[in-house]
Amino acid sequence: NEELEEYNAKLDEDQQYDSNDMVGKLGLEQSYEDQLRGVDGSQKMYVDNMGKVLEIIEKTDSVAGNDIYLTLDSDLQKYCYNALEKELSYILLANLKNVTTSKEKEDIPITDVYSAFFDNNIIDIKALNAANATDNEKNVYNTFVSSKQYTLNALSDILKSSHTELYNLSDQYKDYMEFICETLSSNGIYDSSAVDKDSDTYNNYVNDKISLYEYLKYCISQGVIDITGIQTSSDYYDTDEIYNVIVDYVLKEFEDDSDFDKRVFKYMILSGEITGSQVIYLLYDQGILNSTTDEDYEEFTSGVLSNFEFIYRKIKKLEITPAMLALDPCSGSIVVVDPATGTVRAMVSYPSYDNNKLTNVIDPDYYAKITEDKTTPMYNRATMQRTAPGSTYKMLIAAAGLQEGVIDVGSVITDYGTFSKVVPSPACWLRSGHGTLGLADA
């Protein structure tokens, strides 16, 4: 196959892999494959017509590959991972607000947390309709089915009858219009890169002045819509007929589209069709939290803890983690280097995954789970992501300031959270600032 050919492309014939070889595909196993790989053994033998071995006439023993030794400190590695997760949770809690929506970019409304459980597949939507579903799950599912059908009917009316301009649509249905374009694009029907970005129609659309109906008909006339991938009854259509084919296709796609379903849940939560209490009970219904061992369960069910207080406490305890929510921030990395030797003592990417489930025999359910995870745990941020240095940069600035005499060990500054002397103005994650700090504390 193609993968085997790729592995063997630069190898001599006697060193090439065959389909039975085990190959490192991720992490260290992949990076050091040429070191870890051993040499296959072989046997030549005589067998009878039943396959029974009669005599081994030649044998070559296999040879193990080389060992590799890491400089990583296992305990430090675990400590850094846990510390990073805890720090991310503190930032989430600092920005978490008991509101439905917020205009402040850094705020995280509690409704975003409820939606995140669906959006990042923590709550299994399909399980809501299982034979053993709880009453709460069934109630949520029935509400969802009704709301989804209402939404599909409304979209059909907007696209086929009213042709409502975007400025006359609610934010919810503007979002659905954008999602329709995304779906058409990802399915190879709409080529957004081929649209004339200087055209009046395009600019009117992005500025909410016209309807999606008018914009798609323009795209059809410009040849940036391709319906050859859609099964149709004819090879020849005019513009109106192509538009109707697209609309029918989209509405049919949305009947069984998990991303569309997640959007429906998002707006059900925002409108109050599904309450925060129902979402929290779903966490217990589906085994994400355990009502038997959970010390907060009784306080929640008795009303001592509000929905917001319950979620806040669970995030603080890391029973609900940043990785589960996939809200900003939900990821990070730590690299610890020994300054005396330059050896790497810890290299952590959060969130991570269990690569033992992806070696030799791949666990398909687990692989599907992590590839669909919004936090992209298979992306190693410690080695692959370029990010601002953050607080690490403070040591460099402090050393430079001391060396140049701009500050001394007794200098203090007042941190207001945002550095407004330049535009754009960089801001700390804690927008209110850290107050007055000395050199050691900063």
Which residue stretches match the model-derived regions?
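Preference for short coil/turn "hinge" residues that link or interrupt alpha-helices
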Residues: 21, 61, 69, 376, ...
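Glycine- and small hydrophobic-enriched segments that form the cores of compact globular domains
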Residues: 337-372, 376-381, 386, 403-405, ...
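Short active-site loop at a secondary-structure junction
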Residues: 66-72, 326-332, 365-393, 410-413, ...
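Periplasmic/cell-envelope proteins involved in peptidoglycan metabolism and beta-lactam response
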Residues: 1-365
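Short, glycine/proline-biased beta-turn/loop segments that scaffold the active-site neighborhood
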Residues: 358-361, 387-439
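Short alpha-helix boundary/capping motifs
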Residues: 108-109, 369-371, 426-429
